[in-house]
């Protein structure tokens, strides 16, 4: 996770890579009928062509502020699924795998929809033991008619980037059973958003050590919970019995429109079958948080300002990242404005591709940010390991980042520090933008700023020239990042920083062969890396970047709703998994370190007034707010 708190202007992060332009890409390229590459692969529905409505909808005006949600806890229960199925390809994989491995000791009911052995049919292997004739999703072996849980589907619950794996406990792969009301999963609610549930089946043919990264996607559902407790209808004594019944029915209908409350059957998207999921909301009249509300688990990052720890909130059991910042240090470094900007931005934004702020609080010595713990690793880590990404994977990440930057621009925020270290991957392979310490707030489209900040290899020419810059600086950095993902290095990289600055200002943009950077990508990069910010693609808004033919096959509505299954999933075993973090940090004992030095004066403390954040309020003020992402405006279901 990108918690390197001191990374600012003078850092360089990527040494030259050997054989950068000859290494094979990370996944195979899928082409459509016209020979063009499609943006994602791996168990997804086909990607429909984009249209102007999709682009315009995602760059619509800012929606009115959403109503503030009461602080509380969302309680989720999983009950059962029915009618799950594999795609024809994976049906064949399953059947052939288990037949080839000759699981002849198994006894399985022939009916895929029943747990009973009554009426079963079986064939006999040479061992003389009965063997099932069923195949496909139910092809796995059983013991006395029961499936091992490793052959049953599991669910991934995702609420505000808090992600939890839930295994089915019994039933069949086709009709699994979960624990129902016996096991509830609690999520802290800090803003109105949806619950995403994705279903997977373990891949019996996965490579050794692949973990969950090659598991088979079965489908997904989106739940729109009701973030208030149910209000029962009370009979009106002035009405007749019949009229009261009508009024009660109307009341119940209105209640349903406020969101799901209770258990309901929901059909799977991008899959077959349905699943029964229960949700409820409990208001939590909690006082301000303090450090004692969390168990400290591991250190996952450090810097001169403080450190980041993996923590567990005691009342819900959810895992978070707790970022601690020493007040005295940021005061001495004149970093108070940057630190407050990070908190302010995180409190405002509700976007699927940005790490959400859950809470913030303070002590006399420190500031604390409680963020979603996104533990699939930095994009930097994966790019270093693979050297470069194939065109589909690079396009997918670029599209999600484009939506994240568009969202920030909609809130008059320039990001200014886009780089692989500041991009995290979640369990499912979607990106999450983090580290907002260099953001510039309150920037209208025509506004210019002159602050010299960023990371050397990503600095735009206008920033180096010192003539002021606008939001278009973010489109330059997006181009640099796309170039790096495709080739392994930023376009003007040099180990000598001054030479790199000269190249950024003067060197012509060059590309490797077209099998690495295809013509559509080359054209997009040429226009994003235009040294004239007024000519640069994106100068008139994100819509003109989305309209570029490099993104021709992306449906932006689906992308914003995270309906595309990423082609790569990190190997993450659970919410507490820290294997994608540097052992230099995780081996350290987690503790809230004592702060030496004089007590801060009241004047110094006043700089941090309004820091604490427990629930959003409507609006964009510094007190926080959960305002709907402008990218979601006017998108019809």
Swiss-Prot record:
EC number: 2.7.11.1
GO molecular function: ATP binding; protein serine kinase activity; protein serine/threonine kinase activity
InterPro entries per UniProt: AGC-kinase_C, Kinase-like_dom_sf, Pkinase_C, Prot_kinase_dom, Protein_kinase_ATP_BS, Ser/Thr_kinase_AS
UniProt key word GTP-binding: no
Disruption phenotype: Leads to abnormal hyphae growth and impairs the production of conidiophores and asexual reproductive associated structures. Resusts in thermosensitivity. Leads to an increase in ergosterol content and a significant decrease in glycosphingolipid (GSL) levels, especially the metabolic intermediates belonging to the neutral GSL branch including dihydroceramide (DHC), ceramide (Cer), and glucosylceramide (GlcCer).
Residue span, AGC-kinase C-terminal domain: 552-623
Gene Ontology cellular-component annotations: chromatin; cytoplasm; nucleus
Phosphotyrosine carried by residues: 613
Compositionally biased intervals (Low complexity): 20-29, 104-116
Domain (Protein kinase) ranges: 294-551
GO biological process: negative regulation of TORC2 signaling; positive regulation of induction of conjugation with cellular fusion; positive regulation of transcription by RNA polymerase II
Annotated positions of the Phosphoserine modification: 593, 612
PROSITE patterns: AGC_KINASE_CTER, PROTEIN_KINASE_ATP, PROTEIN_KINASE_DOM, PROTEIN_KINASE_ST
UniProt cross-references to SMART domains, sorted A to Z: S_TK_X, S_TKc
Signal peptide positions (record): none
Biased composition range(s): Polar residues: 40-61, 117-136
Catalysis performed (reactions): L-seryl-[protein] + ATP = O-phospho-L-seryl-[protein] + ADP + H(+); L-threonyl-[protein] + ATP = O-phospho-L-threonyl-[protein] + ADP + H(+)
Record-stated family: Belongs to the protein kinase superfamily. Ser/Thr protein kinase family.
General function of this protein: Serine/threonine protein kinase required for vegetative growth and conidiation. Important for fungal survival through the regulation of glycosphingolipid (GSL) biosynthesis and cross talks with MAP kinase pathways such as the cell wall integrity (CWI) and the high osmolarity glycerol (HOG) pathways.
Cross-referenced PANTHER family: RIBOSOMAL PROTEIN S6 KINASE
Self-association and partners: Interacts with the sakA MAP kinase.
Full protein name: Serine/threonine protein kinase ypkA
Native source species: Aspergillus fumigatus (strain ATCC MYA-4609 / CBS 101355 / FGSC A1100 / Af293)
């Amino acid at each position: 996770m990108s918690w390197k708190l001191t990374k600012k202007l003078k850092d360089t992060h990527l040494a030259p890579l050997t054989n950068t332009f000859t290494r094979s890409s990370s996944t195979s390229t899928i082409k459509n009928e016209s020979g063009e590459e499609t943006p994602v692969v791996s168990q997804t529905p086909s990607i429909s062509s984009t249209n102007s409505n999709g682009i315009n909808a995602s760059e619509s005006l800012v929606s009115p502020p959403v109503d503030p949600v009461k602080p509380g806890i969302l309680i989720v229960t999983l009950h059962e699924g029915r009618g799950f199925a594999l795609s024809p390809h994976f049906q064949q994989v399953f059947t052939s795998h288990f037949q080839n491995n000759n699981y002849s000791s198994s006894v399985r009911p022939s009916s895929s929809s029943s747990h009973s052995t009554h009426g079963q049919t079986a064939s006999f292997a040479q061992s003389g033991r009965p063997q099932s004739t069923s195949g496909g999703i139910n092809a796995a072996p059983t013991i006395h008619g029961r499936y091992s849980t490793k052959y049953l589907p599991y669910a991934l619950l995702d609420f505000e980037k808090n992600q939890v794996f839930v295994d089915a406990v019994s039933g069949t792969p086709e009709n699994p059973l979960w624990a129902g009301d016996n096991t509830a999963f609690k999520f802290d609610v800090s803003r109105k958003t949806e619950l995403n549930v994705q279903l997977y089946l373990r891949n019996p043919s996965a490579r050794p050590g692949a973990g969950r990264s090659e598991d088979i996607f079965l489908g997904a559902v989106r739940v729109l919970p009701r973030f208030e407790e149910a209000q029962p209808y009370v009979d009106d004594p002035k009405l007749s019995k019949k009229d009261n019944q009508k009024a009660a029915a109307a009341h119940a209908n209105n209640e349903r429109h406020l969101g799901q409350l209770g258990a309901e059957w929901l059909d799977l998207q991008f899959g077959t079958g349905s699943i029964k999921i229960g949700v409820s909301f409990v208001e939590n009249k909690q006082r301000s948080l303090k450090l004692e509300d969390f168990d400290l688990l591991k250190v996952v990052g450090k810097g001169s300002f403080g450190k980041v720890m993996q923590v567990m909130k005691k009342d819900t059991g959810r895992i978070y990242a707790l970022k601690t910042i020493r007040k005295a240090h940021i005061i001495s470094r004149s970093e108070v404005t940057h630190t407050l900007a990070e908190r302010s931005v995180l409190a405002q934004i509700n976007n699927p591709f940005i790490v959400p702020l859950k809470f913030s609080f303070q002590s006399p010595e420190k500031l604390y940010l409680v963020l979603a713990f996104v533990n699939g690793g930095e994009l930097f880590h994966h790019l270093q390991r693979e050297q470069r990404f194939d065109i589909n994977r690079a396009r997918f990440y670029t599209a999600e980042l484009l939506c994240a930057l568009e969202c920030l621009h909609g809130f008059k925020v320039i990001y200014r520090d886009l780089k692989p270290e500041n991009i995290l991957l979640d369990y499912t392979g979607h990106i999450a933008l983090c580290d907002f310490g260099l953001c510039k707030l309150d920037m209208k489209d025509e506004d210019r700023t002159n602050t010299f900040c960023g990371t050397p290899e990503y600095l735009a020419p206008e920033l180096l020239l010192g003539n002021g810059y606008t939001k278009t600086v973010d489109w330059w950095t997006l181009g640099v990042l796309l170039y790096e993902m495709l080739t392994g290095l930023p376009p003007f990289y040099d180990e000598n920083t001054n030479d790199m600055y000269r190249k950024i200002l003067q060197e012509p943009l060059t590309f490797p062969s077209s099998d690495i950077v295809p013509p559509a990508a080359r054209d997009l990069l040429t226009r994003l890396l235009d040294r004239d910010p007024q000519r640069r693609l994106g100068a008139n808004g994100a819509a003109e970047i989305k309209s570029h033919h490099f993104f021709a096959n992306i449906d932006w509505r689906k992308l914003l709703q995270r309906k595309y299954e990423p082609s790569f999933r990190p190997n993450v075993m659970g919410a507490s998994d820290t294997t994608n973090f540097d052992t230099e940090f995780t081996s350290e004992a987690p503790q809230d370190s004592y702060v030496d030095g004089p007590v801060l004066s009241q004047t110094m403390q006043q700089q941090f007034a309004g820091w604490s954040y427990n629930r959003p309020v409507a609006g964009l003020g510094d007190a926080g707010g959960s305002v709907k992402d402008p990218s979601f405006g006017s998108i019809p279901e």
